[in-house]
Amino acid sequence: MLLNVEALAKKENLTYSEMADAMEYLYKLDYHPVAVKFFWDETEYNNFKAEKVPGPKMTVCQIALASRMNNYIVKANADNLMCGNAKTCFGFRAASDEEVDGHVKYTADWDFAKECLLAKPMLPLGKLKGFMTAPLGKTPVEPDVVFMVVNALQAYHILNDYIGGKKVPTLQFNHTVNSAVCGGMAWCYNEQKPNMNTMCAGSYTSGKTEKGELNLFIPGGDIGALAGQLVRRTAKYGGPSMVGSPGQEWPGLHVCKKCPMVKFKDAE
């Protein structure tokens, strides 16, 4: 392996760079995990040194994309957002009847659409000053949330390692009619629990997620326990896979479990 799993497994605390390296290599992630930081102080936000800021207004999905795929540290505030759903979920504005009109397509019922809107996870109204997204491996601050775009079997392994690392036997998630990424971040932050949801219309079309992936969110304070469990488990079994016999290199090798026709023997 290119990664020294044995050495990492002996460390009491991993750096964010080591966490990212372990997760990207062992889970075979397609994208960088994204560290998300919420700024509640205007001065702290203004003084934060980012590599990039949005030019035109963007969605949260597009802003996170720059960290997930282009390795940039980005900061943004309400003035940078064109996505009304994100403004509401991040507490930059209050929910309104006008916003309900855009939700009726999900319910075919205006009153129930309003109920669905008001049930979304939201950060405290008027408190957030801005936010940062950065590749986990180069985050300059402790993240509030770590956001990942993963396939189903990657999610399976990540969440199982969360369970093992945090000693929490089951997990439950929050799905809303849209606002998958912004609402997913808000719910993870508010509840301090992992979250997983499908793409919404915005995250599918604006977030460059065309391959049917899932959105996954881990509380920032828990990412060390998750990554630590991953490297300890891999060191014990020889590989990260939990599918079939443990210890294979690829998490989610696409073969039938215990199929007698898929069997290898030593070469002569």
Locate each region found by the language model.
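Acidic, serine/proline-rich low-complexity intrinsically disordered regions
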Residues: 3-268
